Amino acid sequence: EIGVRLVGSEMCIRDSIRLAIRHVKDAAEEASGGRRIYTALDVGPTGKLLKPMGDLDFETAYETFKEVMILGEKAGADLIHIETMSDTYELKAAVLAAKENTSLPVFATTIFDERGKLLTGADVPSVVAMLEGLRIDALGINCGMGPEQMLPILEQIMKYSSVPVIVKPNAGLPKQKDGETYYDVSPEEFASVMRHVVDLGAVVIGGCCGTTPAHIAEMVKQCKDIPVKPIEKKSYTVVSSYGQSVFLGTGSKIIGERINPTGKKRFKQALKEHDLDYILKEGIAQQDNGAHILDVNVGLPDIDEPTLMKEVVQELQSVTNLPLQIDTVDTVAMENALRIYNGKAMVNSVSGKQESMDAVFPLIRKYGGVVIGLALDEDGIPATAEGRVQIAKKIIAEAAKYGIEKKDIVIDALAMTISSEPEGAKVTLETLRRLRDEVGVCTVLGVSNISFGLPSRPIVNSIFYTMAMQNGLSVGIINPNSEDMMKAWYAYHALMNLDSNCENYINKYAQQPGTAPVSATGSAHKMTLKSAIERGLREEANSITSETVSYTHLRA
């Protein structure tokens, strides 16, 4: 529909792409001098923002791009170059449309501002993480600024990217004179900076707005003999949302556990009643209390989990910019969520069972993600650290067959209840150490499992949490609304010099009394109308408004 409206008619789209590619191929053959010159189908944005920031559905955008991609391949394009994208969600729709409907290599470039942000908020690591997860062939930056202004962004891209990098600047920043836009970087100046771009590691270079044949010719002249740097594989374990990236492996991160019906009567009721505002408030409370990632589990008997999981993920991403952990054993629900997720999600989980790996790894390969590997297999949970480490190695080896790297695997060392397994904590801590030191993989635990069946569980949980962090826990699945757990987290990072000058600890506790209550959930705190509107909580905003109007009426 959008393609038809933008170009004029279905026939016009088909003919425009066919004729454009034919003319480019004719020109390339004429100028080739016997060299092989490739023709790229260049695909830009739709001009619309996707929901929730705009009114365009993800799948509608996908279908629009799909039509163009298919026509491009049929017309003879050698590759697809998606460019000038300012929204990771639209970018994902375009990449999936290209990969699912053609066999062509896919390049993608985005338009960053001087802060290193896309229009919709994504930073450089977020964009790189998502695109690499989608198996892009090359990525980079185009438009928006001149070559000199692009250098700081390029340095960030080179730091995180493990695939070839593309740079296509404007001929400087756009300027106005007598009502006309012009660019003031000369071909010589442009080419001089592009030499530095190649020195930094860019593999594909070109020009965007304001560049002329003279700019490109001078760039080729100055850069053609510069050796191309080899591509360096990076080992960052990173998850992302549309607005931020979270790196695992430095300090210990927090996955908020509250969006999960297990043991939560009120949450189960909310799922059955389709009370999404309750779920969203759980997410917001955890973000406010320090979570870095939010677990999302909506599995209940007699609930359409695939549909509800997709809906909850979309709604959560409209009110929080934290990365999400897709927590389900239903692979249909998992794929639904991964497909519409805006970023690179965490996925909970796969196990060492062959059936599990056969089902989950293809989804991770297709959509990207950091997947949690449970240290159990067909024989159950090993009683020893050695057994769990061997299963971890098995998971990593099997993932490699799908092209999934170790950096995109986090192993759950499994916290066992000490009331029934007295040696459970010791085995788990040893497993954490060995996974860190011998296997070199990030780790995760559902920390509160350790205390099940015991009185005063917060005491056991917080002490064990500290011990786990000391033994290599990369990320803990905890309740961030619990003061005991958060005190343990802040204190540990201050004591281990993972909190520069104890800044986070001081900011958190300098104005607080020495003791504070433990909260099982943060949902009960009173939210203001302003906060409800800013968070996108429609039902909460309506409720607060009604209460305010009623109170005002009574006072009158």
Regions found by a protein language model. Name each.
Residues E1, S16-K51, P164-I166, K234-G256:
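Glycine-rich, aromatic-flanked loop segments that form ligand/cofactor-binding clefts
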Residues I2-G8, I13, H553-A556:
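Single conserved hydrophobic/aromatic residue that forms the stacking wall/gate
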Residues E10, R14-A31, K92-A108, I157-P169, ...:
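Alpha-helix-loop-beta-strand connector modules within alpha/beta enzyme cores
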Residues D42-T46, M85-D87, T109-R115, N142-G146, ...:
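Active-site beta-loop-alpha junctions enriched in small/polar residues
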Residues K48-T64, I111-A122, Q176-E189, I254-K281, ...:
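Active-site mouth loops of central-metabolism enzymes
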Residues D55-L79, S86-V106, K117-V163, E188-L200, ...:
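Alpha/beta enzyme core
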Residues R115-T120, P125-E132, A138, E148-F247:
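Domain-level signature for proteins that mediate thiol-based redox and metal-cofactor handling
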Residues E218-M219, C223-P301, P306-M309, V313-N321, ...:
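ATP-dependent carboxylate/acyl-activation modules
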